[in-house]
Amino acid sequence: MADIRWDALWTHVHLATLAADADGYGEIRDGAIAVRDGRIAWLGARADLPAGARAEREHDGGGAWLTPGLIDCHTHLVHAGNRSNEFEARLNGVPYEHIARAGGGILSTVRATRAASEDALAQASLPRLNALRAEGVTTVEIKSGYGLDLETERRMLRVARRFGQTLRVRVRTTFLGAHAVPPEFAGRADDYIGHLCADVLPALAAEGLVDAVDAFCETIGFSPAQTARMFDAAQALGLPVKLHAEQLSDQGGAALVARYGGLSADHLECLTDAGVAAMAEAGTVAVLLPGAFYCLRETRLPPLQALRQAGVPMAVSTDCNPGTSPLSSLLLAMNMACTLFRLTPLEALTGATRHAAAALGLAGTCGVLAPGCVADFALWRIDRPADLAYAMGLNPCAGVVKDGAPAR
């Protein structure tokens, strides 16, 4: 038999492949995984390693569990400013409406972000990203949406791109100009959407800063008609879409984004049966955001059983943002998804890997351990995969591999 040459080989590891055709976690006890050119070349039981196989670098996992690298598929982690004062005020009985009228809320983050330089934005945001990376996250989505003007949206997306180019993490950028109406367009939401579609999005897309387009479709955000205009502009530029949908009320957003073949609909506490059916038909991923549910002390759960029965993939993410989910731990988000939403640990881990990849248009690229996929994985000092969604306040991550090379 001809020699088989690999760049790297990990042995003495237990694999949780999370492959779609696997039973449960896709466990392979006492396994091995080989990498060539940044991709998985082989995996299986260590006893089944091909005869004559050789690797330039061999790593002994010491009995660790090895999973796909985690994927945080919905974050707003690039921003300036701090809103802990609002958190304190709300807990002291001040209504959010009073806070907003006094200049707080999302527009306070917009002011702080507009005032920050690109370097200052990067410096403020890096600790949030590094907290995720320390927990085995190898892919992260980062949205704009705290600039609401061309120059600040550009700065936010440039920071996100910089992180992807300079750190061992894959970054997918999402343009969220339709997040709120900025002060200069107060009372003129239609005009603002027109400005985004005609001026801002085309300019940012031309600079290669946008991987997808999102909007906040809600009574306090943008109407379905305004959202559809945003999606039309995105599709004209060849960009996929996703949506903040049905968080506070049923606006038909899930069915709308499904009609556009959207990657995901996110939040979904007020999702209807019609929305579930539309998502199932389109293959749109349901992104669950238990951090926002927790911080807002919501009581209405997304229709988890209906999503399960319809076969809608469910992803789990942090929704890291300064106002409603200041959460930089995907492991804690997984625990919240189990505790608050009653996901199983398997559903939570699959939601932070394979289904999160699909929510970013990366299905078949990452999120599973399979030959041909990028070699992004994490090693864990745990007894079984369910521990990742079980324990709180501990970080059992023993190592991270990005594109086949150790990343920490």
Curated annotation (Swiss-Prot):
Cofactor dependency: Zn(2+); Fe(3+)
GO biological process: L-histidine catabolic process to glutamate and formamide; L-histidine catabolic process to glutamate and formate
Cell compartment(s), UniProt: Cytoplasm
Annotated positions binding Zn(2+): H74, H76, H244, D319
Note describing how the cofactor binds: Binds 1 zinc or iron ion per subunit.
Protein residues bound to Fe(3+): H74, H76, H244, D319
Pathway connected to this protein: Amino-acid degradation; L-histidine degradation into L-glutamate; N-formimidoyl-L-glutamate from L-histidine: step 3/3
Source taxon at top rank: Bacteria
Stated family: Belongs to the metallo-dependent hydrolases superfamily. HutI family.
Name this protein carries in UniProt: Imidazolonepropionase
